[in-house]
Amino acid sequence: IIAKASDRLDTALESYVDKVTIEEPSFTDNKYLTMLLSFMGNKPDVNTHKFMLVYNKNVDKSGMFQDSYPKSDDGYLWLELYHYRGTDVEVEPYYIYNCFKISPKQLGTKEFSEYKGIKILHKPIGKTNNTEILTIKF
């Protein structure tokens, strides 16, 4: 799911606090972002896990990644990746390819040609609570 952050979405994201690492990102000309996501789990049923890629339209960038944003516009489209593991427990790493269709019109952003690329904030597995930034240049 890719969505714009809003008050309703902010409430829904409160449970999306589990860690996820991004590997092998690929952005195509037809605006599909494919990533290999790694996360901790115990069930082989990956449908237990939910992922949400969010454009934070809030001026103050409030939320889990607020402190990771640059102080001024750096020319990139910034997105936030969230993970919810449901009732699954963290036992071993699992991997899944996930594909997101990104539409500037849907997000209410500038066209991709006006950006240098995309930066995705995420909390990777196997680390402290630090945020990492994945950069995809156009």
Name what the model sees in each region:
Residues S26, C99-S103, K137:
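Generic structural detector for well-ordered beta-strands
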Residues I1-E23:
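Transition segment at domain starts
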